[in-house]
Amino acid sequence: MSFNYSMNTPSPSMLSFDMDIPITAFLHNSDVFQLFHPDIMEQVVVNKERVFFPTPSFNVLNLESDCLYKMSLRFDKTNNKRFQFNRQTKQWTEYDKVSNHKESEVFVHPSEIRTGDDWMKSPVEFFIKVTNLRSSESDEVICLESQCKYQPTLLIQKVFRDCFGCFQAHGPPVEIKFALLTFIATTRYCSRRIADIKSSLNPFSSQDTKKKNKRNTLKAVSQEENQPIENSSFHQSFSNQYLSKPDLDLKSTTLLQIAPDHSFEPTNFVSSSHFPCWDSIFCQQSFPTPSSSPYSDSLPHFTNEWNTPTFYNENFMSYPNFPNY
């Protein structure tokens, strides 16, 4: 036994199969689905799985507290006709092409079997993934045919445990249909009004995602301008230990003059490719460590105005303890 409730009846009710206890179900978020009225709601179905949105949520009342129930949502085709969108009237109309006959898809709630008291404590939400790929055999994904109209039906099945511990159905399920949930499956939104409503309701819509990605990109560029050194292990450690001025860039043709207190002063010089010793720093190779003396005479240093190399010596400055990589 089932009833098909019109849009003028937002709170449908239904008698159970034994006609003793009236089982009542309400569309908890009926105000959300009412936004699409009088147009027919559209749901995009493509090869990639997409979440059915908005998420239908139901309040179920008058279940027997100690009895076991199973909730599911069935997707029935309203007919075997396909629909096309008229750009002039902005309405969906039937045309002669007949859709492929297929049994209705049923999505079982992940909670599966619970007591009536548990089902009535809070709204029952159905997070469903839909696709038009027929090869998908997952129980968590519903396959729908594009350009077809569907009517979701809430199924409330009373079950019991037999002597073998298996669950068996106790009579036929209670079926409740909501006209507000009727939709047409399509590969893309045809009605601009429907698309705008869904975009305003969905915080993860493509428009909001693009704006957010643009803000993140501008923020990342701003951070890169304030942090010229590359985010590598060598440069990060090198800057943290030895650089006292954050505006120096290892990529520029500037040599770091080592002072006795291990601070650095930039000095212009000719291209670093003339000196493999300094290229080893920029290429992140191991920096040579003196074996016998803490001072080195092998490091080129440019201090005069002709940019000719001079060398560190014991009387000039100490050699810092560079880390080994």
From Swiss-Prot:
An individual GO BP term: positive regulation of transcription by RNA polymerase II
Intracellular or extracellular location(s): Nucleus
Keyword tags: DNA-binding, Nucleus, Transcription, Transcription regulation
Stretches with biased composition (Polar residues): 219-236
Example GO molecular function: DNA-binding transcription factor activity, RNA polymerase II-specific
Region entry Disordered, spans: 204-236
Coiled-coil parts of chain: none
Knockout-associated phenotype: Knockout causes abnormal development of the pharynx, when cultured at the restrictive temperature of 23 degrees Celsius, which is exacerbated on a ceh-51 mutant background. Embryonic arrest occurs on a ceh-51 mutant background. Expression of homeodomain protein ceh-51 in embryo is reduced; abolished by simultaneous RNAi-mediated knockdown of pop-1.
Pfam families the UniProt entry points to: T-box
DNA bind region: 32-210
Disulphide linkage map: none
SMART domains: TBOX
GO cellular component labels: chromatin; nucleus
Domain of life: Eukaryota
Biological role stated in the UniProt entry: Transcription factor which plays a role in mesoderm development, probably by regulating expression of target genes, such as homeobox protein ceh-51. Binds to DNA consensus motif 5'-[AG]T[GC][GT]CACC[TC][AGCT][AGCT][CT][CT]-3' in promoter elements.
Protein name, UniProt field: T-box transcription factor tbx-35
Organism this protein belongs to: Caenorhabditis elegans
Annotated gene: tbx-35
